[in-house]
């Protein structure tokens, strides 16, 4: 005796309704063999649709067993049930259940995508099926552009995409006119002639008479199961000749009758998880996974494009968040670099030595131990690039009839280099001028404007510094500082000239030491303190390391950037919540689409992937737009703020993309998980 292809044994299905359960199927026993054409007939509410859902592995029995090819479906997990639906069942629904936003070819390709069929192969198969069913010229029409009969033929073609060993047709003619209904019945007869098992669920006895076997169901129980004595007449009415139909339709479905006429074809085994699979299997799995991912990306893009305004509003929070993060980081980096440049202009990598114990020491003026010999000793140290002395007084300057007070500083020839000062006119004095106490002077722009005006060239002019004539040989360039513009008048002369001819003192007010590049500033500071203490016999001085200022500025800049970035991240989180909200709405709107995908064999992971990809795509697009806006803001910033610029780093941009992706994953996961956990029956029933 032949083993049935589909077998229900003592199947009961009940649904909760308040405090009680409603029994929809009661102790149903049914066997269907391969190659049969069966009609399940019953009135509305009789349980026929629930029976079809159990047969198609969309639902499961509350009690009893259902086997497919001898395999108990109760023992299968959700992915294995999806594999059964994908590879052995094809559904033809009364309401067609086609995706409205894609064309006929794309609707047909959907089961093959989840089966891992290569793109070229599934595309060719879809076009072939449409051609054989008379829809070659409608291949790229969307469902809304097709008649009801044409949509049902597309639905039949989709059921055949992966072979369709068992065709489950739920009221296949219910929404069609008479002519279209007859065409659908004829196609089902032709498929049965090829060996497909056909199960027609209907309330119309005129449709049921086209089956070889009629099963009547009432109040959840099978009340009759009999052969159809009028089947031959119905076949003739449909205009189907079995022999001709088999020959003509074999090419239409592309299946071997021999294969489909097996009495007990074995359903596929569970997916092999053996890590020692061969390379070819891994390649096929990778190709199948890539195809599903590409489909998820394509459908996500279609969903976003079909709701442009909603997508833009959803992305707005992400755009604002990413723009804020990238811009704030760029502003912080630009500000930090500008501040460091400003500090560099007054001498970076330098250590200043002053008399006394600290700032404000009342006895500092009485300490006269800093002398030029200390400068010479420091210059000889391996960690010192240069050392320059400094002594200063406020003296009267006179040029012709103009008298002004200015700060006159006696410095060494390396002073200007150590302080990073540039010259607008002339040059600095050299070592020879220092040694010979030459009466030359370098002035700043403020002094130039006071004595000579803004346009006159002062080089070579003689000015009186406290009645000592000095020749102007250089003018330093103006500096626009973040710490404010300097209004004081400054004159620099060789420290030997200042000590011997102007101040009458042999000691120094301070020494500026420039540390060699690559030498640790803190270690150099300790070494020079040790040296100076040895020379003086006691520590009667203190040091001020400019490196500490640099570190303070860097730390302050980092703290400020972090604070502002945290504020911007709040905006990003708000945007992420908006994405989650819209994705939840999208899942609700597309519940029927989810049900269709599950019916044709999509796994829960496929549904999860599709909606997760959609959320990530929204966030990535928002991130890309946000980064572009940040660059635009950077350009505008440069137009209005000339002193410094926003500095964009590759790290900040990569971080922005990572943040937008993580936002999509984190806030898109819950809606995607909700979508993947939908019951396919409930999903298909929703509008």
Swiss-Prot record:
Q: Where are the transmembrane segments?
A: 312-332, 560-580, 617-637, 650-670
Residue ranges of every copy of the ABC transporter domain listed in the record: 6-244
User: What PROSITE patterns does the entry give?
Assistant: ABC_TRANSPORTER_1, ABC_TRANSPORTER_2, MACB
Q: Which Gene3D superfamilies match?
A: P-loop containing nucleotide triphosphate hydrolases
One CC-aspect GO term: plasma membrane
Bias type Low complexity, positions: 246-256
For membrane topology, the record states: Multi-pass membrane protein
Annotated positions binding ATP:
42-49
* A Gene Ontology biological process term: response to antibiotic
Q: What's its top-level EC category?
A: translocase
> Residues annotated as region Disordered?
246-281
Q: EC number(s) of the enzyme?
A: 7.6.2.-
- Which keywords, in A-to-Z order, does the entry hold? Antibiotic resistance, ATP-binding, Cell inner membrane, Cell membrane, Membrane, Nucleotide-binding, Translocase, Transmembrane, Transmembrane helix, Transport
Location of this chain's protein in the cell: Cell inner membrane
Q: Does the keyword Cell inner membrane apply?
A: yes
GO: which molecular function terms? Answer: ATP binding; ATP hydrolysis activity; transmembrane transporter activity
Q: What does this protein do?
A: Non-canonical ABC transporter that contains transmembrane domains (TMD), which form a pore in the inner membrane, and an ATP-binding domain (NBD), which is responsible for energy generation. Confers resistance against macrolides.
Protein family membership = Belongs to the ABC transporter superfamily. Macrolide exporter (TC 3.A.1.122) family.
Q: How does it assemble?
A: Homodimer.
Name assigned to this protein: Macrolide export ATP-binding/permease protein MacB
What gene is this protein translated from?
Answer: macB
């Amino acid at each position: 005796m032949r083993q049935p292809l589909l077998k229900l044994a003592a199947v009961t299905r009940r649904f909760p309704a308040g405090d009680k359960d409603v029994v929809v199927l009661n102790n149903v026993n049914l066997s269907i063999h391969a190659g049969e054409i069966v009609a399940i007939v019953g009135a509305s509410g009789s349980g026929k649709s629930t029976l079809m859902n159990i047969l198609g592995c969309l639902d499961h029995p509350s009690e009893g067993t259902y086997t497919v090819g001898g395999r108990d479906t109760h023992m299968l997990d959700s992915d294995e049930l999806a594999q059964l639906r994908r590879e052995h069942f094809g559904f033809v629904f009364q309401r067609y259940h086609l995706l409205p936003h894609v064309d006929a070819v794309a609707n047909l390709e959907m089961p093959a995508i989840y089966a891992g069929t290569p793109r070229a192969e599934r595309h060719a198969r879809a076009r072939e099926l449409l051609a054989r069913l008379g829809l070659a010229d409608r291949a790229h029409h969307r469902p809304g552009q097709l008649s009801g009969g044409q949509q049902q033929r597309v639905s039949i073609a989709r059921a055949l995409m992966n072979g369709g060993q068992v065709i489950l047709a739920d009221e296949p003619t219910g929404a069609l006119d008479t002519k279209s209904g007859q065409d659908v019945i004829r196609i089902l007869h032709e498929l049965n002639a090829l060996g497909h098992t056909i199960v027609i669920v209907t309330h119309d006895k005129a449709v049921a008479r086209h089956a070889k076997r009629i099963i009547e169901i009432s109040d959840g129980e099978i009340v009759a199961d009999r052969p159809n004595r009028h089947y031959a007449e119905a076949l003739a009415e449909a205009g189907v000749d079995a022999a001709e139909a088999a020959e003509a339709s074999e090419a239409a479905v592309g299946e071997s009758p021999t294969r489909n006429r097996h009495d007990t074809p074995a359903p596929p085994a569970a997916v092999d998880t053996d890590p020692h699979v061969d390379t070819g299997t891994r390649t096929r799995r990778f190709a199948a996974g890539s195809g599903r991912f590409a489909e998820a990306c394509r459908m996500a893009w279609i969903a976003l494009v079909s709701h442009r305004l909603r997508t833009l509003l959803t992305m707005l929070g992400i755009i604002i968040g990413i723009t804020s993060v990238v811009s704030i980081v760029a502003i912080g980096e630009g500000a930090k670099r500008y501040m460091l440049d400003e500090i560099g202009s007054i001498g970076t990598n330098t250590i200043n030595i002053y008399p006394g114990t600290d700032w404000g020491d009342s006895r500092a003026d009485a300490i006269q131990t800093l002398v030029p010999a200390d400068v010479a000793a420091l210059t000889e140290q391996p960690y010192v690039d240069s050392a320059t002395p400094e002594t200063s007084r406020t003296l009267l300057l006179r040029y012709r009839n103009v008298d002004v007070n200015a700060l006159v500083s006696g410095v060494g020839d390396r002073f200007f280099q150590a302080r990073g000062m540039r010259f607008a006119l002339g040059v600095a004095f050299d070592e020879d001028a220092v040694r010979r106490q030459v009466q030359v002077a370098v002035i700043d722009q403020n002094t130039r404007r006071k004595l000579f005006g803004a346009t006159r060239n002062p080089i070579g002019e003689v000015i009186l510094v406290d009645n000592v004539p000095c020749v102007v040989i250089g003018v330093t360039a103006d500096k626009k500082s973040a710490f404010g513009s300097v209004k004081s008048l400054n004159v620099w002369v060789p420290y030997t000239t200042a000590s011997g001819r102007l101040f009458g003192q042999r000691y120094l007010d301070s020494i500026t030491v420039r540390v060699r590049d690559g030498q640790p500033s803190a270690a150099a500071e300790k070494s020079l303190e040790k040296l100076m203490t040895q020379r003086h016999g006691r520590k009667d001085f203190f040091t001020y390391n400019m490196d500490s200022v640099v570190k303070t500025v860097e730390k302050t800049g980092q703290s400020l950037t972090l604070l502002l970035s945290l504020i911007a991240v709040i905006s990003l989180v708000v945007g992420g919540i908006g994405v989650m909200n819209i994705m939840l709405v999208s899942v609700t709107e597309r519940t029927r689409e989810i049900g269709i995908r599950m019916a044709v064999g999509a796994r829960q992971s496929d549904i999860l992937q599709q909606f997760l990809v959609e959320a990530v795509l929204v966030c990535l697009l928002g991130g890309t737009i946000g980064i572009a806006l940040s660059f635009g803001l950077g350009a505008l910033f440069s137009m209005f703020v000339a002193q410094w610029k926003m500095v964009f780093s590759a790290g900040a941009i990569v971080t922005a993309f990572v943040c937008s992706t993580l936002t999509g994953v984190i806030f898109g996961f819950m809606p995607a998980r909700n979508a993947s956990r939908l019951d396919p029956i409930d999903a298909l029933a929703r509008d």
